[in-house]
UniProtKB/Swiss-Prot annotation:
It comes from Petroselinum crispum (Parsley). Residues 1-76, 77-152, 153-228, 229-304, 305-380, 381-456 form the Ubiquitin-like domain. SMART domains: UBQ (SM00213). CDD domains: Ubl_ubiquitin. Pfam families: ubiquitin. Residues 457-458 form a propeptide. This is Polyubiquitin.
């Protein structure tokens, strides 16, 4: 059947569709006709925004129905704001909007003055001068709107030493906020504070109102010992070592403690938890290692093995490695020998490009294997090309590559002749002689590939 799509400029587009087409399909057809990427399209019918996965039939869209097309500003996105009454407000925002801007939009919609609004996301109160991007608020995130009661109230916090602190708070303050106020007054970091009221330990994301804490209530403050805890380390001989650690200890620190107890040099230690080899710079907290967790200690045999790395110039480098070395480690060894930064190195073995986090063992690289080193030219970067079928192709390119070059790379990967390719970026069709830099296409940008029908009239 035919339907019509009306744009804000007043232009009407005619599309051939079927009732079973999804909104994604319709947006792809609009992209074919108009070159507008689907992620910049919002379709409205009968006052409702249409969701990608649903079909025309779901919305009772019939032949000769008219949809309205609204363009999302680049970086533009929708977020939701939920009030304490349960009402949800939808806002059009951009990542660069400040919290002030968002409060002004809420005022426009709901009439609530910004100075009475407190916005909460992920248990944190948002500060006016910061942006949505600062808080990693992404499209379709939900913020919570709490109204500031004019005035607030006082509560008391009693420490184990018997000292009482007075705080100015509001019922809508979260426990995080209260701990931050205690830190301001007393210098105690929030992660060392435990607050107790009516015999219950209070959770960070909840509000005072949630716990029915009212004016002049008294909370009790108990100090958490600095993340201190015991963990166990089990060796292959079956021996178990007990260590005193903190969540913030790095794996290096833990290996040093093992050396103190057992005399094993850190460079011969490999620590395993939950089947994963632990990396030196990371902390116990990063791996969610908690009190009384058991790590497994495997000794690295001194010696390892030799492998060869062959460069495009024909030079061969010899490296001392171990099967458990990651590709990152190997690149670091190449940097030590040759001075080539890891981010300019691509390593190939058995025709496969090797990924940084994987080990030599993962790729079955054994002693005296030969890897091939290809240099990524500076300015080299990856971009993505998305086809109408939804497939995404990854290409290695440079900013100075022309659109012709990119089409040739797509032909190499996919077999599609360049004269059948149309590339779209930011709603624009890209011209052959221009470069990626001309269009401000940067690393990890996504281009859209539309096929020119043979004999088409583009």
């Amino acid at each position: 059947m035919q339907i019509f799509v009306k744009t804000l400029t007043g232009k009407t587009i005619t599309l051939e569709v079927e009732s079973s087409d999804t909104i994604d399909n319709v947006k792809a057809k609009i992209q074919d006709k108009e070159g507008i990427p689907p992620d910049q399209q919002r379709l409205i019918f009968a006052g409702k925004q249409l969701e990608d996965g649903r079909t025309l039939a779901d919305y009772n869209i019939q032949k000769e129905s008219t949809l309205h097309l609204v363009l999302r500003l680049r970086g533009g996105m929708q977020i939701f704001v939920k009030t304490l009454t349960g009402k949800t407000i939808t806002l059009e925002v951009e990542s660069s909007d400040t919290i002030d801007n968002v409060k002004a939009k809420i005022q426009d919609k709901e009439g609530i003055p910004p100075d009475q609004q407190r916005l909460i996301f992920a248990g944190k109160q948002l500060e006016d001068g910061r942006t949505l991007a600062d808080y990693n608020i992404q499209k379709e995130s939900t913020l919570h709107l709490v109204l500031r009661l004019r005035g607030g109230m006082q509560i008391f916090v009693k420490t184990l030493t018997g000292k009482t602190i007075t705080l100015e708070v509001e019922s809508s303050d979260t426990i995080d906020n209260v701990k931050a106020k205690i830190q301001d007054k007393e210098g105690i970091p929030p992660d060392q504070q435990r607050l107790i009221f009516a015999g219950k330990q209070l959770e960070d994301g909840r509000t005072l109102a949630d716990y029915n804490i009212q004016k002049e209530s008294t909370l009790h403050l108990v100090l958490r010992l600095r993340g201190g805890m015991q963990i166990f380390v089990k060796t292959l001989t079956g021996k178990t070592i007990t260590l005193e650690v903190e969540s913030s200890d790095t794996i290096d620190n833990v290996k040093a403690k093992i050396q103190d107890k057992e005399g094993i040099p850190p460079d011969q230690q490999r620590l395993i938890f939950a089947g994963k080899q632990l990396e030196d710079g990371r902390t116990l907290a990063d791996y969610n290692i908690q009190k009384e967790s058991t790590l497994h200690l495997v000794l690295r045999l001194r010696g390892g093995m030799q492998i060869f790395v062959k460069t495009l110039t024909g030079k061969t480098i010899t490296l001392e490695v171990e099967s458990s070395d990651t590709i990152d480690n190997v690149k670091a060894k190449i940097q030590d020998k040759e001075g080539i930064p890891p981010d300019q190195q691509r390593l190939i073995f058995a025709g496969k490009q090797l990924e940084d986090g994987r080990t030599l063992a993962d790729y079955n690289i054994q002693k005296e294997s030969t890897l091939h080193l290809v240099l990524r030219l500076r300015g080299g970067m990856q971009i993505f090309v998305k086809t109408l079928t939804g497939k995404t192709i990854t290409l290695e390119v440079e900013s100075s590559d022309t659109i012709d070059n990119v089409k040739a790379k797509i032909q190499d990967k996919e077999g599609i002749p360049p004269d059948q390719q149309r590339l779209i970026f930011a709603g624009k069709q890209l011209e052959d002689g221009r470069t990626l830099a001309d269009y401000n296409i940067q690393k990890e940008s996504t281009l859209h590939l539309v096929l020119r029908l043979r004999g088409g009239d583009f």
